[in-house]
């Protein structure tokens, strides 16, 4: 398996700007993704929020931590900004697709 990041530095925010400028890619029309502050990643994955929420339950870190860490390393956020975003969004329960996830798993809310 080959990943694009093997060949090109992967910086999500810069990739978003490139895609929106050159391909017409549009950010999430509903605003940010649940559990984080970004509005341009995992837009087509209804299970992603639950994956990250369970990571928060199990490990104490989730999507906002991952996103902020990448953006701090790439110079798009300061450490203090990242900490504030993580405190605000990590652990947020993903309600948007809860009915569909429950139906898929054969569960009730």
PLM regions with names:
Residues 1-109:
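Nucleotide-activated chemistry modules centered on ATP-dependent adenylation/adenylyltransferase
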């Amino acid at each position: 398996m080959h990943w694009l990041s093997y060949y090109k530095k992967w910086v999500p925010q810069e990739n978003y700007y490139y895609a929106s400028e050159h391909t017409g890619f549009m950010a999430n029309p509903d605003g940010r993704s649940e559990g984080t502050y970004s509005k341009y990643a995992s837009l087509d994955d209804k299970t992603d929020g639950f994956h990250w929420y369970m990571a928060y339950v199990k490990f104490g870190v989730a999507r906002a931590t991952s996103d902020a860490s990448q953006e701090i390393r790439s110079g798009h956020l300061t450490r203090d900004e990242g900490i504030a975003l993580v405190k605000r969004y990590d652990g947020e329960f993903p309600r948007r697709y809860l009915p569909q996830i429950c139906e898929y798993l054969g569960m009730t809310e």
